Protein backbone atom coordinates (compact mmCIF):
# COMPACT_ATOMS: atom_id res chain seq x y z
CA UNK A 1 0.00 0.00 0.00
CA UNK A 2 1.09 3.54 -0.69
CA UNK A 3 1.29 6.49 1.70
CA UNK A 4 -0.69 9.64 0.95
CA UNK A 5 -1.31 13.07 2.41
CA UNK A 6 -4.83 14.23 1.66
CA UNK A 7 -6.31 17.66 2.29
CA UNK A 8 -9.83 18.83 1.72
CA UNK A 9 -11.63 22.14 2.16
CA UNK A 10 -15.23 22.14 3.35
CA UNK A 11 -17.66 25.04 2.86
CA UNK A 12 -17.87 27.76 5.50
CA UNK A 13 -21.65 27.19 5.93
CA UNK A 14 -21.05 23.68 7.24
CA UNK A 15 -21.07 23.22 11.02
CA UNK A 16 -17.89 21.85 12.66
CA UNK A 17 -19.81 18.68 13.57
CA UNK A 18 -20.62 18.15 9.89
CA UNK A 19 -16.91 18.46 9.05
CA UNK A 20 -16.27 15.64 11.52
CA UNK A 21 -19.06 13.62 9.89
CA UNK A 22 -17.51 14.17 6.45
CA UNK A 23 -14.18 13.02 7.83
CA UNK A 24 -15.68 9.87 9.33
CA UNK A 25 -17.50 9.18 6.04
CA UNK A 26 -14.25 9.30 4.06
CA UNK A 27 -12.41 7.33 6.76
CA UNK A 28 -15.04 4.63 6.26
CA UNK A 29 -14.44 4.62 2.50
CA UNK A 30 -10.69 4.18 3.02
CA UNK A 31 -11.11 1.43 5.62
CA UNK A 32 -13.70 -0.39 3.48
CA UNK A 33 -11.16 -0.61 0.66
CA UNK A 34 -8.44 -1.99 2.94
CA UNK A 35 -6.64 1.22 3.90
CA UNK A 36 -5.78 2.90 7.18
CA UNK A 37 -6.17 6.50 8.24
CA UNK A 38 -3.31 7.88 10.32
CA UNK A 39 -3.00 11.34 11.79
CA UNK A 40 -5.84 13.81 11.21
CA UNK A 41 -5.33 17.56 11.60
CA UNK A 42 -8.35 19.83 11.60
CA UNK A 43 -7.10 23.37 11.05
CA UNK A 44 -10.52 24.90 11.52
CA UNK A 45 -12.15 27.74 9.64
CA UNK A 46 -9.53 29.73 7.72
CA UNK A 47 -9.71 32.43 5.04
CA UNK A 48 -9.21 31.40 1.42
CA UNK A 49 -6.70 33.13 -0.84
CA UNK A 50 -9.50 33.69 -3.35
CA UNK A 51 -13.23 33.01 -3.51
CA UNK A 52 -14.29 29.48 -4.37
CA UNK A 53 -17.97 29.03 -5.27
CA UNK A 54 -18.84 32.26 -3.41
CA UNK A 55 -17.01 31.15 -0.24
CA UNK A 56 -14.38 33.35 1.37
CA UNK A 57 -13.52 30.89 4.15
CA UNK A 58 -13.30 27.12 4.45
CA UNK A 59 -12.63 24.38 6.98
CA UNK A 60 -9.21 22.84 6.28
CA UNK A 61 -8.58 19.16 7.12
CA UNK A 62 -5.29 17.29 6.56
CA UNK A 63 -5.27 13.46 6.70
CA UNK A 64 -2.42 10.92 6.48
CA UNK A 65 -3.56 7.79 4.65
CA UNK A 66 -2.01 4.37 4.04
CA UNK A 67 -4.20 2.79 1.35
CA UNK A 68 -4.27 1.23 -2.12
CA UNK A 69 -4.86 3.46 -5.13
CA UNK A 70 -8.41 2.13 -5.57
CA UNK A 71 -9.39 3.43 -2.13
CA UNK A 72 -8.03 6.90 -2.94
CA UNK A 73 -9.84 6.91 -6.29
CA UNK A 74 -13.15 6.02 -4.63
CA UNK A 75 -12.70 8.65 -1.90
CA UNK A 76 -11.92 11.33 -4.50
CA UNK A 77 -14.92 10.25 -6.59
CA UNK A 78 -17.20 10.71 -3.61
CA UNK A 79 -15.62 14.09 -2.81
CA UNK A 80 -16.30 15.27 -6.36
CA UNK A 81 -19.99 14.48 -5.88
CA UNK A 82 -20.32 16.12 -2.45
CA UNK A 83 -21.33 19.79 -2.60
CA UNK A 84 -19.87 20.54 0.85
CA UNK A 85 -16.32 19.86 -0.39
CA UNK A 86 -14.85 22.89 -2.17
CA UNK A 87 -11.43 21.45 -3.05
CA UNK A 88 -9.36 18.37 -2.30
CA UNK A 89 -5.83 17.27 -3.06
CA UNK A 90 -4.06 13.96 -2.55
CA UNK A 91 -0.29 13.65 -2.73
CA UNK A 92 1.70 10.44 -2.60
CA UNK A 93 4.58 10.67 -0.09
CA UNK A 94 7.56 8.49 0.78
CA UNK A 95 6.82 8.62 4.53
CA UNK A 96 4.47 10.41 6.88
CA UNK A 97 5.77 13.19 9.10
CA UNK A 98 5.86 12.26 12.78
CA UNK A 99 5.43 15.77 14.18
CA UNK A 100 2.64 18.27 13.60
CA UNK A 101 2.43 20.03 10.26
CA UNK A 102 3.99 23.47 9.96
CA UNK A 103 0.57 25.08 9.73
CA UNK A 104 -0.75 23.46 12.90
CA UNK A 105 2.46 24.37 14.74
CA UNK A 106 2.01 27.97 13.57
CA UNK A 107 -1.60 27.99 14.77
CA UNK A 108 -0.55 26.61 18.18
CA UNK A 109 2.25 29.14 18.47
CA UNK A 110 -0.14 32.00 17.70
CA UNK A 111 -2.67 30.69 20.21
CA UNK A 112 0.00 30.62 22.93
CA UNK A 113 1.24 34.08 21.94
CA UNK A 114 -2.29 35.42 22.28
CA UNK A 115 -2.52 34.01 25.81
CA UNK A 116 0.85 35.51 26.72
CA UNK A 117 -0.30 38.87 25.37
CA UNK A 118 -3.38 38.77 27.58
CA UNK A 119 -1.25 37.96 30.61
CA UNK A 120 1.15 40.81 29.91
CA UNK A 121 -1.68 43.28 29.39
CA UNK A 122 -3.56 42.57 32.58
CA UNK A 123 -0.82 43.64 35.06
CA UNK A 124 -0.32 46.83 33.08
CA UNK A 125 -4.01 47.60 33.37
CA UNK A 126 -3.87 46.88 37.06
CA UNK A 127 -0.90 49.23 37.44
CA UNK A 128 -2.68 51.96 35.47
CA UNK A 129 -5.76 51.55 37.65
CA UNK A 130 -3.60 51.69 40.78
CA UNK A 131 -1.89 54.87 39.56
CA UNK A 132 -5.26 56.50 38.88
CA UNK A 133 -6.45 55.66 42.39
CA UNK A 134 -3.35 57.17 43.99
CA UNK A 135 -3.76 60.48 42.20
Curated annotation (Swiss-Prot):
Region (Disordered): 99-135
Keywords for the protein's UniProt record, in alphabetical order: Ribonucleoprotein, Ribosomal protein, RNA-binding, rRNA-binding
Keyword Ribonucleoprotein: yes
A single Gene Ontology CC term: cytosolic small ribosomal subunit
Keyword Transferase: no
Membrane-crossing segments per the record: none
Record GO biological process: translation
Molecular-function GO terms, alphabetical: small ribosomal subunit rRNA binding; structural constituent of ribosome
Job description of the protein: Binds together with bS18 to 16S ribosomal RNA.
Protein name: Small ribosomal subunit protein bS6
Source organism: Bartonella tribocorum (strain CIP 105476 / IBS 506)
Gene name of the encoded protein: rpsF
